[in-house]
């Protein structure tokens, strides 16, 4: 896939990238991953989505771009400093809720069958606590 083919980048992504680079944060999603996230989110109308690893909000911006008005996104990260960037750019969107806490703790305290899609971009849910994450689907 040629990155130049990604023409409809969410408006917030450019500003998030500027803030991300200014902070020296180097773990944001690539544009191709973002475009794929938007497609996945669009496949779940009215969906309840979970992102583990908010970072500066790059992935969340793409998920929100693909979501319909009835969908919701919970996004979790332990680092309040990077989540603040995401909140500044995405916090006015009523569909998103930010959780500054350990992802493993979030997974363990959330009821089973609570989400329709999980994007695990952090240690919990990807490399540890996989069974906890899968139980939420």
What are these regions (language model features)?
Residues 1-117, 124-137:
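A short alpha-helical cap/connector motif
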């Amino acid at each position: 896939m040629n990155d130049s083919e990604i023409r409809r980048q969410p408006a917030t992504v450019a500003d998030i990238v500027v803030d991300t680079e200014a902070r020296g944060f180097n773990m944001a999603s690539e544009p191709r991953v973002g475009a794929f996230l938007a497609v996945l989110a669009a496949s779940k109308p009215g969906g309840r989505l979970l992102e583990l690893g908010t970072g500066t909000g790059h992935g969340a911006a793409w998920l929100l771009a693909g979501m319909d008005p009835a969908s919701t996104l919970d996004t979790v990260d332990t680092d309040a400093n990077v989540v603040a960037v995401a909140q500044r750019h995405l916090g006015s969107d009523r569909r998103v809720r930010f959780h500054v806490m350990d992802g493993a703790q979030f997974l363990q305290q959330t009821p089973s069958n609570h989400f329709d899609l999980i994007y695990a971009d952090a240690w919990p849910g990807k490399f540890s606590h996989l069974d906890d994450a899968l139980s939420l689907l």
